Amino acid sequence: MINNKIGGRNMVGRAVNRLAGRLTAVALTAAMAVSMLAGCAAGGKNTETAAKKEDKPSAMEQMNAKNDPNVIQDNYRTCYEVFVYSFFDSDGDGIGDLKGLTEKLDYIEGLGCNEIWMMPIMPSPSYHKYDITDYMNIDKQYGTLDDFDALITECHKRNINVIIDFVINHTSNEHPWFKAAADYIKSLPDGAEPDPSECPYVDYYNFSKTNTGGYNQLPGTNWYYESQFVDSMPDLNLQSEAVRGEIDKITSFWLDRGVDGFRLDAVIYYNNNNQTETIDDLTWLVNNVKSKKAD
């Protein structure tokens, strides 16, 4: 009997425990459901808030919009230098050309560049083109003047300015000016001095009977000519009015074709390093160009 009573109480206790467990489970489930609903509601608000934040321009975007650069007022540009020879070949001859450069303007624009500085593009016997034989043409390896005009048009459509290397400190020794001057010097009798009235081109260069620094001997004569770099690049006499007259025609030629400016090469070597004369030359050149294109 005693055992039966004890067993009955145990059975009642287990039943109560099972009921309590079920009630606890129900309560926990309800609590979890409420929590999940609250979380979903909160998450929805957070997503909506994030979306609103994404729609709003960032502080940097707002600042850039307020400070959109005005190139007309400040003339600052992000410039991309192009060595045409090795840039992009459009015809498969292994040498870059103007058509190839034109094909890649979208790439250059995509970099954020709004100016191109073209290394020398004028006719020259060398690959680098710094020894020029004709200042008013395009080297045939690079294309034609028509190709250049097309390049300028496409650049300006994209608000890309074009500046070209303007090598006026020297020419090639194959330039017609130097060839005429050299032939004239070689024809002079012993003791005779060059006369620009007989050969105007002799005044385009600096000839001397003294072998000073930066001069090379003219083959077959006792005369020397200034050539600060190498003997194949005779230096121009930038103080000559005749040379300045040629430069005036050259700047007009390229500005009329749409060039936006010129880059001058190796100015510290002008006039055999005579700073006073160089400043005079540069002042004259700047005034000359600005009289044709103020910006």
Language model region names:
Residues 1-57:
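Gram-positive cell-envelope targeting signals
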Residues 40-43, 55-248, 256, 267-295:
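Acidic/aromatic-lined carbohydrate-recognition and catalytic surfaces
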Residues 252:
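C-terminal active-site rim and adjoining tail of enzyme catalytic domains
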Residues 260:
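Receiver (REC) domain switch/active-site residues of two-component response regulators
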